[in-house]
Amino acid sequence: MERRRITSARRSYASSETMVRGHGPTRHLGTIPRLSLSRMTPPLPARVDFSLAGALNAGFKETRASERAEMMELNDRFASYIEKVRFLEQQNKALAAELNQLRAKEPTKLADVYQAELRELRLRLDQLTTNSARLEVERDNLTQDLGTLRQKLQDETNLRLEAENNLAVYRQEADEATLARVDLERKVESLEEEIQFLRKIHEEEVRELQEQLAQQQVHVEMDVAKPDLTAALREIRTQYEAVATSNMQETEEWYRSKFADLTDVASRNAELLRQAKHEANDYRRQLQALTCDLESLRGTNESLERQMREQEERHARESASYQEALARLEEEGQSLKEEMARHLQEYQDLLNVKLALDIEIATYRKLLEGEENRITIPVQTFSNLQIRETSLDTKSVSEGHLKRNIVVKTVEMRDGEVIKESKQEHKDVM
């Protein structure tokens, strides 16, 4: 039964050894502690005393019973270790498959997703930059047109102010001409009144003289001829009338000339005033048209500025959303990297556990082989013992592979003394 258990344990170890393979960073595991079988079989002398055979047989039976119990316990532990190794191998395979899947698919897929989204984001950013540049060019053109229209409006305003100033001057000249005409009319009226007054005075003087002549009836008889007073008065009257007529004619001629001059000036001023009013109306219409154009351009400019602000705000929002998306993707990538690192760490830990279990299994196998060899050796040859020391050293050959060196050290002892020692090295690549 013990042999069957050992054979089944060997078979289980062989099957598990063929299944256990892994990849991961190397780690120096050191050497396995030296194993000694001196505690199980005490050294025997070279010559056997047959008188002590019974005692030796009794001691051997007790030793065999204790060794059998110890082997059963070790066998049970070995079976539990094998079950644990199988369970860990299954987990190792699942983790290795998941790791290979992550290595094969996730980075490439994630990189493709990143590249596609980055290309889309760059394309949209280029479009937004182009639209922004186009809107800036349109805004600059509209600003230039607005400056030109403002300059034209300023020129037209200056012309309107100049026309208003000329109109004010013309109005002042017309007022002055009106005042001059009124003054001349007043002077003509005063001259007519003066002529009437002088005529009345002259008539009164003539009447007084006639009355005086009628009252005085002086008859002077002289040798000379009598003077003709009526002729003298008539002559005086004629002279006064001639003077008055000439004065009136001169006054009328001067009044007519002045009135004609004032009429010409007034007509010219009226024509200039009419032209100024016409020009003012034209300027007013042009000013209204330019004001309407300016208002429309202001509305267009405000609309374009509003659209530009909306575009900038939308661009800022989209940029913020893209930045958030990039940050989120980077966080997801970082979390995936951390998860991958965690899986790798777990895989490394499981690999270390597996290597430790492999070492322990190898140790138990060596113990079992030594036990089988000791069982097959006759009693009289118990003085020759072989102790093997196994050490494992793992060195990194390349990434993803482990190189395991198994050193088997054989020591032959007789009477507690080392008489022969040999060492064998086996290389195993995992």
From Swiss-Prot:
The record's Pfam families line, in alphabetical order, gives:
Filament, Filament_head
Query: Looking at the UniProt record for this protein, which Gene Ontology cellular component terms does it annotate, in alphabetical order?
Result: astrocyte end-foot; astrocyte projection; cell body; cell projection; cytoplasm; cytoplasmic side of lysosomal membrane; cytoskeleton; glial cell projection
* Chain spans, region Coil 2A: 229-250
Give the region (Coil 1B) as residue ranges.
114-212
Per the record, which residues fall in region Linker 1?
103-113
Could you say which protein family the record assigns here? Belongs to the intermediate filament family.
By what name is this protein known? Glial fibrillary acidic protein
> Which parts of the sequence are annotated with region: Coil 2B?
255-375
Q: Which PROSITE patterns match?
A: IF_ROD_1 (PS00226), IF_ROD_2 (PS51842)
Q: Which gene encodes it?
A: Gfap
SUPFAM superfamilies reported in the protein's UniProt record: Intermediate filament protein, coiled coil region (SSF64593)
Describe how it is modified after translation: Phosphorylated by PKN1.
| Residue ranges, annotated region (Linker 2) | 251-254
Coil 1A, as annotated region: 71-102
Q: Which residues carry this modification: Phosphoserine?
A: 12, 36, 80, 267, 321, 383
Tell me where it mainly resides. cytoplasm
In the record, Phosphothreonine modifications are located at 7, 41, 108, 148, 381
Which residue positions does Omega-N-methylarginine occur at? 11, 21
The PTM Citrulline maps to 34, 268, 404, 414
